[in-house]
Amino acid sequence: MKDPIDDQIPKRIKHLQFGINGPEEFVKDGTVEVSRRDLYTMTDRSPAEHGALDLHMGTSNKQINCATCGESMADCMGHFGYVKLALPVFHIGYFKATLTILQNICKDCSSVLLSDQEKRQFLKDLRRPGIDNLRRSQICKRINDHCKKMRRCSKCDAMQGVVKKAGPLKIIHERFRYVRKSQDDEENFRHSFDEALKTIPELKMHLSKAHDDLNPLKVLNLFKQITPVDCELLGMDPEHGRPENLLWRYVPAPPVCIRPSVAQEGATTEDDLTVKITEIIWTSSLIRAALSKGTPISNLMEQWEFMQLSIAMYINSEMPGLRPSDMPSKPIRGFCQRLKGKQGRFRGNLSGKRVDFSGRTVISPDPNLRIDQVAVPYRIAKILTFPERVTTQNKKHLQDCIRNGPDVHPGANYVIDRESGFKRFLRFGNRNRIADDLKIGDIVERHLHDNDVVLFNRQPSLHKLSIMAHLVKVRPWRTLRFNECVCGPYNADFDGDEMNLHVPQTEEAKTEALELMGIKNNLVSPRNGEPIIAATQDFITAAYLLSLKDTFLDRKSISNICCYMMDASTHIDLPPPAIIKPRCLWTGKQVFTVLMKPNRFSKVLVNLDAKTRSFSRIKSKTPEMCPKDGYLMIRNSEIIAGVVDKSVVGDGKKDSLFYVILRDYGALEAAEAITRLSKMCARFLGNRGFSIGIEDVQPGKSLSSQKEILVNKAYATSDDFIMQYAKGILECQPGMDQEATLEAKISSTLSKVRDDVGEICMDELGPANSPLIMATCGSKGSKINVSQMVACVGQQIISGKRVPDGFQDRSLPHFHKNSKHPLAKGFVSNSFYSGLTPTEFLFHAISGREGLVDTAVKTAETGYMSRRLMKSLEDLSSAYDGTVRSSNSDVVQFVYGDDGLDPTYMEGDGQAVEFKRTWIHSVNLNYDRHDSAMLPYEIIDYVNRALDDPKFLTNCNRDFIETIRTFVIENIAKYLASVRERRDLAPMLEEPDMDDLDDMEGDEFAPVAKRKSVENIIRVTEKQLRSFVDRCWEKYMRAKVEPGTAVGAIGAQSIGEPGTQMTLKTFHFAGVAAQTTLGVPRIKEIINAAKTISTPIITGQLINDRDERSARVVKGRIEKTYLKDVTSYIEEVYGPVTTYLSIQVNFDTISKLQLDITLADIAAAIWNTPKLKIPSQQVTVNNTLQQIHVHTSSDGKSSETEVYYRLQTYKRVLPDVVVAGIPTINRSVINQESGKIELFMEGTGLQAVMNTEGIVGTKTSTNHVMEMKDVLGIEAARYSIISEIGYTMAKHGLTVDPRHIMLLGDVMTCKGEVLGITRFGVAKMKDSVLALASFEKTTDHLFNAAARFAKDSIEGISECIVLGKLAPIGTNVFQLIRRTEEEEEQKPKELLFDTPSLHQLEITA
């Protein structure tokens, strides 16, 4: 154990202040000035003094000690040096900041280009307390925009032009760019070139391009003149640094240990940074010599530029904008390259690092282990150790471990003395003596033992259940083994997967791991509360076979099976046999009774009604009479009816057996039940035998002949459609052309063939058929897989369509060109049993390849998406006041998920209680014949009183209380009343009025037989009702989200993890034919807050939603119609006086399209087309001929050629003029669902659609989040994000609790604008520099933080991990305050000047 009090507390970093070092700091921090180009001395090859490898900066040689601190290579942490530059140079990291400051100041007097009044206003905004980085950067942007527009300095009246970048690290000032008339300043500037023009007259032609060159020296002098107040306006803090520090005057030389020399065969290879430092020193010395001796200015400028590039590449070797000649021959690693990227310092060594006390090997299954155990090989157990402190209780055991030593298990590797801290390795020395000398308080690093806590992890770690705590079971052999039921959360299989093991090194860590990450506490997925640890594959098959109606066991067999599942310590009470004569037999279902309730002392009484996979309802019969025994009914842990299949013992179902035990009796009982099932099923199936062979998939003769008939019939139907298409008489489906209609019809015909053949195949295979058993019980495969093996593989689909034509208008060279026949487009009529023909094999391979490519692409896409989600949401946690806050205490949600409930504990679909099952459970547990039955009005009265209890009103959500009340009234009281009415008794929903004689008769005078018959059907007692209400309250309180829960991280994983199960390229037909993007691309669009999306669709409700004709009228108003759609022809007319285009309008088409337009409307559309620029007088309307004439210009000045070409232009552009509808709506589709008609519109323009006559504007929405925000505001955008992500997930059959999606929606919109989860959005969401640096654009964020003197308070998750600080989340969310007892009254200390001797005597007159 750790000592309770520790006086040696390590210091914790409270905050990081970023800034820019000035020359003084570089000299002060540096231990030596680096001024020599030589690395080693010529005499003895030792590091040269004042060279780049000077020993004062540390050493990279094991034999030499540091000259500054005297330590060896292992202990010296290194010291900085500095290089003094001959001339200042620009800093590549602050180049953008330098450019911005130059744009903001006068290039003569360095004053900020604002008036005094503007300065005061901006300073007031910048000095506002509590201002965040986003707001500050917006103010600085406004100042920059303002200054860029100023043409003269208000202080010195100097001209100001454009300051811009010219090539890498070059800034120019085009002072006279905006001068219209020549001014004195410009004249003077021009005259300054007179002398040069005399010498080189050719310069005159380039004089107009002359500009000021703002070299580093000039910029440095300008920056030195900036006043402290102006520094604030430039976004800098004059206390921490000034603008002139943005330029290099001294360059730091990093410690030698981060740029070590590699010695090889008498020579050394130097690090890239060392080489660059020598290059900088050499160039600087050349410039210094040139300045002292004098040299042509061109040479000096060239050397200065070279030094500038060298220093830039020293910082960032991937500097943009370099000429190929300036690029190094091989890429070098500058400072930026060492920090950024996956392998850089941030992501590779700070946020994520390699750890000690971890092991990795192949995994294999072992059903004999408990689900919370992991079998660890002896070899690993002897290497991984746990530091156990010696106490009186464990001293003897630890002494035995020490005597065994490191090579015998259970042994120990090290002993650490408590007083001296000396660590002793037990491979050497006298172990017996060491064991005898062991003192209380010493630490023994012992081997792993049984029941030690370890963390078990499989990569990729997609959600929090990818790393969980197991208990060790040390076993022989070489693999890590665990129970197969735990494969689900790890997504593990045993085809060669490897997994990692981590050993927590303190008692607190062990406890926390067990409580928070233990298997028993993580049986359900936090994504939606569904069970994730449950029976799998063979276990399900065995359970199914055992629970069939025809499975009977004698006493020997059932005793054997019961012993399979228990350990020797559990007492078993066999249930009474189901058949007594001629001999005692038990049913397979009774085995499950023992599994749930092994003996009479067990308190587990399961009550459950659930549909299994084989359930089919028969009219006029109760569900448990299902012919396939497909309705499971359990009462008090006894199976009354139903088989046990995947839906009962598998994962992903909330009405499964283990989930019910978990919710009613806790995690311990549920884990115990899963362990029993896995032991029993593995052993039972091993003895019974279960195999699959080729004869299992052999089709019978009748199946083959029926398949032949069905396939030939489908081919004939397809040929008929192809013939209609060829003749052009195929009737088009809504929103499709003939080709698309043909494809849709053939596809539906062929898919029906496979389904029909599959049905026949299922009927023909016997009940003992192994593949069919597996498909039926859900342990592996589906009925489609079986029918593909036996009967027919079916149509191959590529990107949602039949196989496309590859080359020369055909899918393969084996077919005719443009063939649409099923065989030519990927229909495989053979089964895998009969074998595929060569063409079928190729089609099947094409389809298979698409799946592989899709998976590979999807993995990278979803991985990056998950990382971005995690980075943006990781800081969010629930606080003690119920709010969800970010690390800097910004409120993101006032109540988590609008109700404060944890998705992990949701029993129903997003509800804390599954009322129906809870009611059945309460009724069966509290059944007593002697309790009096309640009447409907008594039930209502009791529940109203119970729900008005303060414990409900203060702790529960009002909606939850109302849901309970509604359930009891509708499902219990009213049902009882209806049963009474059917038995001719008064319903009694209201309390009888004692004054009314009719009411007084009541139940007392009703026949006993009738009352009994009602009670046989439904009998409600007060005890049952009380139990039900109490259970509801308990479950609700348990489901409340705990303070400190990392709701953000769990939400990010819950959205990111299902992404890996989604297909990538997925299109889905919304309604009839509006093709919408789904899957990963759609989720990406939403979380990126994309301005343009691939398939924007507006859904509009119609005022008259029953009449199709009125829907067509509205469609005509919305869908854009081109001129070419409503014209018969357009012809050119060349007359003696005028030439024009004659457009013949077809009013039959206009009436068919239900368009409300006239000739005048079409003419107006033509002259309003901006592309044509036709004056209105050139467009004339002829109503009698229903024609529009578009004339060429009437001025008569145009030549014949001009007139001809103008007519051709008109003729080309006019057909595409939009004459009706909304130009941004490409098309609209009428969709009829459940009798109601609605419109789907492809395109944008929500506001225009909402204002269209015939559309209900308040019930119109779009799937384009940004458009929703622009038209309806930020709340609408939030709702749109939530509904769109939910819809996309649901379309892929994935359930994600809405609370996770709501949190994402709130994070994206809580700043008042829709911020995408991208590097730009995250930068606006977070203020922390380290968090942004560990995400993307590492060095950019660090340079920006330094330039604006940012302060990082280190409160978020990323920052705390980088700096090794405990993150304020989970068990660390609270702070402890120790109240000291004041023994005596504290008196204030006397001040120095209160001492009388220090006072002068007062002199009185």
Curated annotation (Swiss-Prot):
It catalyses: RNA(n) + a ribonucleoside 5'-triphosphate = RNA(n+1) + diphosphate. InterPro entries: RNA_pol_asu, RNA_pol_N, RNA_pol_Rpb1_1, RNA_pol_Rpb1_3, RNA_pol_Rpb1_3_sf, RNA_pol_Rpb1_4, RNA_pol_Rpb1_5, RNA_pol_Rpb1_clamp_domain. This is DNA-directed RNA polymerase III subunit rpc1. Pfam families: RNA_pol_Rpb1_1, RNA_pol_Rpb1_2, RNA_pol_Rpb1_3, RNA_pol_Rpb1_4, RNA_pol_Rpb1_5. It comes from Schizosaccharomyces pombe (strain 972 / ATCC 24843). Its main location: nucleus. Belongs to the RNA polymerase beta' chain family. Mg(2+) binds at D493, D495, D497. Zn(2+) 1 binds at C66, C69, C76, H79. The gene is rpc1. Component of the RNA polymerase III (Pol III) complex consisting of 17 subunits.
